[in-house]
Amino acid sequence: MAELVAAVGVPHSPHYPSQYPKDGPQDTPRTYREVKAHLDAAKADAIVVIANDHFNTFFMNNFPTFAIGVTEAAYGPNDQTKMPHYDFAVQSSLASHMLKTAMNEGFDFSVTQEFGVDHAMLVPLHYLTDDVKTPVVPIWVNTFSAPLPTARRCYALGRMMQGAIRSLPQKLRVAVIATGSFSLEIGGPKVDPGKRNSVPDLEWSKHLHRRIGKAEFDEIVAEATPEQMWKAGNIGGELLNWVVLLGMIGKDKPRYLADHDEKDGHAYAVWRWD
């Protein structure tokens, strides 16, 4: 049977690969290396990545609430992110099993069988893997094109995904990466004058960081209303990627939780069960 051996939450700024070499001394690559050490120790055979698309894989004429990639291989980045190009394998048996389980459990994934991925998935994989050699299962969540899915629905999706992994007959060690910011505004009215981006609701981001450290996931689900996420910035809905992850975790506290990043309104966390 397959087993969930690790779960991590990280940011995915498209500027990181050009700003910070993997082995750089700055806080960002150093923290990614801390997270990567946990993933390496978990010895995963497959990685499920939960992220949002930025109108690169999908567009407004067909922008799904939840989507899954079911194929043999994919590539990225499919946007203008300055980083290495990767061709990577998709763990198709796990992806197919998750799709079938979702349908049986009342979750109607959109399915794509030919696709690239943008920086939201590839920046974390760039820092957290060795050249994306581990097969991936891509999961997309709509986090900024209203109406967004509710936090309750995203948490339930995570519970379903956990069950799908554990019911796969194949022996497989699975890790999960969720990626996104808690409070961030890019190029919008909440950006401070003269800046490209801002953190509109720093207290909300710090509050979420504390909640995660205490495994207060039900409280996060209750508090993550559309109004609150919008107050946190036009990128604030990326919290929903994390909420899916929290649904997969259960009630465990993180084994590793980096200091809250006040400059960019995000966090790094690791859970392990290996």
Segments predicted by a language model, with ranges:
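Flexible, D/E/H-enriched segments
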Residues: 1-45, 57-156, 167, 189-274
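Non-transmembrane, aqueous-exposed alpha-helical and coiled segments at domain scale
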Residues: 159-174
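Extracytoplasmic, non-cytosolic globular domains
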Residues: 165, 182-186
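Beta-strand elements within well-structured catalytic alpha/beta cores of enzymes
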Residues: 45-51, 139, 172-180
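Catalytic metal-binding/acid-base residues of hydrolase active sites
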Residues: 53-55, 182-183
